[in-house]
């Protein structure tokens, strides 16, 4: 009793399907840095906002911030969601509570950790701090401009030619025609 070719192909296809599923489940996730990290956190967390480091209740001594975890190591959805802020109480929850605040207490916004303006500022801060190659590009541009200026100064003409045409401004030719 031998194994037929059809059965061996079927077993091979089943093995390949299983192997591809396992590879997809355990492959390393992508890394996220800078603006991509902030955009992804904004998408994942939505209106809740997010933290760059975990809230103090979850901190242990060896914990790293999201930049260290997602930029230098692989990052997945479950890890990103741990950095989302907890939503503030809804109006229904607040109205059901029995505590009443005095009128003279100044109201501070609660639960708005990284809304758009602050998120945009932190994105700009990240972009200012991270990419050194942009600073290098700007330095190269300035160096090229400086070199062009030096070239222009070193290649000055020996005789300074007038910028205006003497015939149109009544130079020597107009005196000769009037004589």
UniProtKB/Swiss-Prot annotation:
Entry-linked InterPro entries: IGF2, IGF2_C, Insulin-like, Insulin-like_growth_factor, Insulin-like_sf, Insulin_CS, Insulin_family
Signal peptide: 1-24
Disulfides per UniProt: 33-71, 45-84, 70-75
Region B, annotated ranges: 25-52
Region of interest (Disordered), ranges: 160-179
Main location: secreted
Gene3D superfamilies: Insulin-like
Swiss-Prot/TrEMBL site (Important for interaction with integrin) positions: 48, 58, 61-62
PTM (free text): Proteolytically processed by PCSK4, proIGF2 is cleaved at Arg-128 and Arg-92 to generate big-IGF2 and mature IGF2.
Self-association and partners: Interacts with MYORG; this interaction is required for IGF2 secretion. Interacts with integrins ITGAV:ITGB3 and ITGA6:ITGB4; integrin-binding is required for IGF2 signaling. Interacts with IGFBP2.
Additional remarks: The IGF2 locus is imprinted. Paternal inherited gene is expressed, while the maternal inherited gene is imprinted, hence silenced.
Protein family (similarity comment): Belongs to the insulin family.
Stated name of the protein: Insulin-like growth factor 2
Organism annotation: Bos taurus
Taxonomy of the source species: Eukaryota, Metazoa, Chordata, Craniata, Vertebrata
